[in-house]
Amino acid sequence: NLKNRLYNESTYQHEIMEEINYQCVNEILTKERKKSENYLLNAIEAAGGSEIDKDNSVDRRNTPCCGCGACQYVCPVQAIKMDNSCGFKKASVNRKICLNCGKCVNVCPFIGRQESKKICDGKLLSYKDNDRAVLLRSSSGGIAYRIAYQGIISGCYIVGCKFNKEQLKAETILIKDKESINELQGSKYLQSSNFNQIIKKVQDADKNIILFGTPCQIAGIKKIFGDKKDIIYVDLICHGVPSQSVMSKYFEYLKRKYGFVKKNTDILFRDKKYGWEKRYISVFQEGKIYSEEKKKDPFYRLFESGFCYSNACYECRWRDKSNADIRIGDYWGGRFKGDASGVNMVVVMSQKGAMLIDEIKDYGQCENQNIMDYLSNQQTENVHKPVFYDSIISDLENESISIEEIISKYVLPIEKQIATERTLRKVKNKVQSLNILSRGIRNE
């Protein structure tokens, strides 16, 4: 429906400048993508697949590792462990005892077909909790807290991520009481350091489980447990996880500049003191307080650049898909622009998810929305891996290089380029508007 915007001598400039109805465009693109996907899947199935590799283990496949630990859990001879590689958890296989049985390959979320669903086939809701105290401690609208709360009072255990104040790491924990829910509140912006260790606790749990995780973690653990009735999966809208080395560099910066010490440090990655959309990061420690907006804070600048994510993040399979029952995140876009305390985007992907949301909807303002809001305002395609990726990861591992030097070398040039392009677009739009106005005056 955009053929009239192809430029030729008979096209009037004011027609080209008219606003495009992107909702209509995106709906057409979504239908065409689905057709293409079905065609490719049918072609693959018709071909019958390939023979199993002789070396049938995850380390012999040219696929990224997200550190979920599913392979480690199913290995019958404990040949796999999760090593730290450049600040990321990564599977390592002991070839001396590996049986090449293929069990690790079968559960790897990056190998084989996924039983995931398209986000566009889900039901989109907005959610904002009625309890102001819940909103203030939550990164957005409080939906994660409310899901966990409802789970606890219904007799479930909750698996989620907390920030370890002593080790400055994100950790996945299992909680059993309402008093522990606040440990899970707030964004972490780090890869969980022990997700692989929680799988055994899920297996041994004597109650139903509500399990929060990144899309790749959920995909991995679901390959182990499947659609068991006693597990509800909730994945998070995820842009990527930075290297733990970013946090190490960041704390060295806080220590050097502001006198922080590595002991009992609380970090609010999304402090709402100036509002939900402002995105401040605040650090607290025994009377010391550091607080800065994202465009000036070194941790945020590195995270937002997208230059130091895990290799797996650049090949994510779940930007517009999910293996979970519910997906949650911030409701970005124009619909709630100006909201001070936060609103959640909630995508219901299954009947189990719908039943859970139905139980909690009266705790807040829960409204049906158009799924196109997700496709228009969330990151539905992978970010490009920078050509200097190996270099920046190496510099992050180098103790003699500061976080300021890394930002100056890699991030600042791109920030300047983006700022220049933004200015040029504004000037161009202003000139075009003046030309249209001038033409209209002459015609009169």
Model-inferred region functions:
Residues G226-I237:
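A short alpha->loop->secondary-structure connector
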Residues L2, L6-E9, I16-V74, Q78-K81:
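Ferredoxin-type iron-sulfur electron-transfer modules and their immediate structural context
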Residues I44, R61-C66, A70-S92, G102-C120, ...:
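Iron-sulfur cluster-binding cysteine motifs and their immediate structural context
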